[in-house]
């Protein structure tokens, strides 16, 4: 609430349960509102907060796909309860996985990303660790990233 108030008001005032501001202007006001991205995984507090307030949910695949879908659905239900369009919240997914080193690993990685896109993931944060050469990075671009982008 505070950030959006500061981005839209010449004389921002906000009184919340834990924080308040008065006259904390942050000129110049942005011409395009920056999206609010919240990374959360907790079903009691974090995910409902994402549904109420966030433009983007940064998630990760802890556990299995069914558990992740349950968490996505909590975000969507919370958005609906807050009077928001659940589909308006973009989903970002952090993936920690080594770069593919073979054609078959690349094909599997691309299929995995396509499947996640079908589950409404629109952004990926990819952590490949520390590649020792550019070869696996170039393989990823050519065999995974470009085909997936072409498909969607």
Model-identified regions with their sequence ranges:
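Active-site-adjacent structural elements that line small-molecule/cofactor binding pockets in enzymes
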Residues: 1-152
